[in-house]
Regions:
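Alpha-helical membrane-anchoring segments
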Residues: 2-213
Length: 213
């Protein structure tokens, strides 16, 4: 075997092993139970975040509150091309009464998500709820909100209602749960967990680098 053939074999083997490692890291089926524990924790944190506005809800989020809708439109107007990014259901609350209705409905959505009721749907709705509060009053945001919204986003991708949820209980009592069903290991659980892990590493890296500035 010539040196050229040895080099070719080395690079082919390296390529194959790298590809297998990459696929195993991202797509190897895994148990969704860790995601379900995360759903409970993130759901409770989201509810705590939402309930923290109860006392000053109207003053903070009303159409004529501290940050009126006109002020927010002016701020968003500076990025008109990306205006859709700042979507908020709270913009529809033109009166204090409607604002409280939106607030209560938002809390109910987060409660359903935490309990694992129609999790695939309520996970997406919960993300929209939290983003609505962030976009409506951006001056109140801190380091907590980006992490919370990141976790909600990635929980939408995986089967976070496979365990510890009303969905699981309903499936079991109705005889739907079986091998290969909601509770089985799947690649989407792996993707969701890996994205969370890498995003958290990115946060820690940026915080560490900021200390050097």
């Amino acid at each position: 075997m010539t040196m050229s053939q040895d080099n070719d074999n080395y690079w082919n083997l390296l390529n194959q092993r790298t590809g297998r490692s990459w696929n195993r890291f991202w797509f190897a089926p895994s148990d969704p139970l860790p995601l379900c524990f995360l759903r409970l924790a993130v759901g409770l944190l989201s509810l705590t975040y939402l309930f923290s506005f109860n006392r000053d809800l109207v003053r903070l989020f009303a159409a004529d509150g501290l940050m009126s809708t006109e002020t927010m439109e002016a701020i968003r107007g500076e990025a008109a091309i990306q205006g859709w990014i700042y979507f908020s259901v709270l913009d529809w609350a033109t009166t204090p009464g409607i604002l409280w209705i939106v607030h209560v409905v938002s809390a109910l959505i987060l409660i359903l998500f935490t309990l694992g009721v129609f999790t695939r749907t309520t996970s997406v709705l919960s993300l929209l709820v939290v983003l609505s509060y962030i976009h409506r009053q951006p001056v109140l945001t801190g380091p907590f909100e980006p992490i919370l919204s990141m976790l909600l986003l990635y929980l939408c991708l995986g089967p976070c209602g496979a365990y510890l949820s009303v969905d699981r209980w309903r499936a079991t009592t109705q005889g739907v749960a079986k091998v290969g069903g909601e509770g089985a290991a799947c690649w989407t659980a792996t993707v969701s967990l890996r994205l969370i892990q890498l995003h958290c590493v990115g946060f820690y890296l940026l915080m560490g680098l900021s200390k050097l500035a």
